[in-house]
Amino acid sequence: MSDKDKNKEEQQKRQLSDLDSDLVKKIKEKYQLIKKKCGSHSPGASIVEKEIPEVNLNIDCCFLSNPYATEIFEKRLKAAIKNEQWLYGQIESYPAQNAQIAEYVAKAIGIKSENIFIGNGATEIISDLLNRFVKGNILIMLPTFSPFYEYVNKETTEIHYYPLVKDKNRFYCDIDRLLIYCQVNDINNIVVINPNNPDGSLIDKESMKDFLQRFSFMDNILLDETFIEYAPQESMDSVFYEYKNITIIRSMSKIFGISGIRAGYCITNEKYVKDLLENGFLWNSNCFAIYFFGLLNDEEFMKDYKEAKDKYMKEIEEFEKQLENCNPKLKFYKSTANIFLGEILDKDKNAEDLMYYMLIAHGIYIRDCGDKKGLNEKYFRISCRKSEDNKKIIEALKLYQ
């Protein structure tokens, strides 16, 4: 066993109190500096590794993607890059325009290309929609994905925050009460993340159909389906043409494990797509993202993806079971995604304590959710990784004191 492997083995057995207090303090100070620069988002694992070399970061649980899907895309991209003429052409030439890429997606999902806008990741799409088409009053359920309130144009739009109901084991949306609130407060725009981030709660398909019908008076229903591939139901794109006010947002980062190439799309009305294309979004995708979108119509690639997804889904199910009773000081809420919202039950501890313990003592990076609207310093989020990593995560959580 190498010295590095021995260090990793020892790291799996430690408490923060076992480490040099000055070293722990130094690491915490460095982390706070880089966190400050990242705003409401956690610093990426690569940044943590670069800026805090004292940390031996082995497992990134802030990362919310399917690790097996990443391998499938990487394999094909490596093969493509070996063709030097192809690679040179991709680098030298302008990429395909937005409308051309939309045709790849249209063919793959059975929606007209005129209703598809390609984004440089879902976050760009969220920003574009909020700033160009959302005016008046917007309702955002909490907890939520922070760009939905960060990118609202505060000069033209007023945000109404509405908490999800929390019971013993889950968060959920009470549609009846939500409807009354919207009618009383003249809400004309609403955000729905399904399954929700960061807690993984789900509005089932029949309830979602009922929701769309009852909220058809809205100017805009922004439905974020970033995690829908992990849920026990299909996308609402099958009923898209039944409603004039719905926009469905899809990130490719989470389900295909390709955050680095920035690929996402939305399904929306032709007017919105035309407006975006006429106002600066012709070439907003890079060559690798375009290569990926082309693979959505590659039967072999999609077959391999399905196998990777099925494998990952089994590991998510097993991981959730192991989380349930791993530590009496920790509580995890029911999820229909690959993410799990946890709560610290010890009154003397908070999620930041757990985050530092996992990072410094075990090299496992989790998300402290104390800065998320609708949550407090007791909450954290953790994602499912590969089975061998999940075992290490569970063991570290069991040892937490």
Stretch-by-stretch model annotation:
Residues M313, C326-A361, C384:
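Conserved PLP-binding catalytic core of the aspartate aminotransferase-like
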Residues Q97, N245-N325, K331-Y333:
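PLP-dependent aminotransferase class I/II
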Residues C62, T268, L341-D348, A361-L399:
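Conserved PLP-binding active-site segment of the aspartate aminotransferase-like
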Residues Y94-P95, A106-D128:
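Short loop-beta-helix segment that forms the pyridoxal 5′-phosphate
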Residues S2-S93, K107, C173, N185-D186:
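N-terminal "arm"/small-domain region of PLP-dependent enzymes with the aminotransferase-like
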Residues N169-A231:
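Active-site phosphate-binding strand-loop segment of PLP-dependent enzymes
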Residues S17, I27, E124, N131-V192:
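PLP-dependent aminotransferase-like
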